[in-house]
Amino acid sequence: MALTKERTASVVQQYGSGEKDTGSSSVQIALLTERIRQLTDHCKVHPKDKSSNRGLLVLVGRRRRLLRYSRRVSMGAYRSLVKSLGLRK
């Protein structure tokens, strides 16, 4: 269920300022979005897997908090991130 190292590295490279930049909010939001997409597909295939459904809700809440922080700090960066990830906001 976790992201592969290659996929994580590509997301960090795409949204981060450097290869080792895993702590910035934009990278964290992008990584959470990838995990959410994977879990969403899993929950569609296995609708009775309640623990995965709860984990999905936890990840969505974490991403929501990070998006709120990103919007508060820099509106321009927030808008470009939401547009590049294809999120509804």
Swiss-Prot record:
Region (Disordered): 1-23
SUPFAM superfamilies registered for this protein in UniProt: S15/NS1 RNA-binding domain
Lipid biosynthesis among keywords: no
Keywords from the named record: Ribonucleoprotein, Ribosomal protein, RNA-binding, rRNA-binding
InterPro entries: Ribosomal_uS15 (IPR000589), Ribosomal_uS15_bac-type (IPR005290), uS15_NS1_RNA-bd_sf (IPR009068)
GO molecular function: rRNA binding; structural constituent of ribosome
The keyword Ribonucleoprotein is assigned to this record: yes
GO cellular component annotations of the record: cytosolic small ribosomal subunit
Source superkingdom: Bacteria
One GO process term, biological-process aspect: translation
Role description: One of the primary rRNA binding proteins, it binds directly to 16S rRNA where it helps nucleate assembly of the platform of the 30S subunit by binding and bridging several RNA helices of the 16S rRNA. Forms an intersubunit bridge (bridge B4) with the 23S rRNA of the 50S subunit in the ribosome.
Membership in a protein family: Belongs to the universal ribosomal protein uS15 family.
Subunit record text: Part of the 30S ribosomal subunit. Forms a bridge to the 50S subunit in the 70S ribosome, contacting the 23S rRNA.
Protein's name in the database: Small ribosomal subunit protein uS15
The organism of origin for this protein: Treponema pallidum (strain Nichols)
Lineage: Bacteria, Pseudomonadati, Spirochaetota, Spirochaetia, Spirochaetales
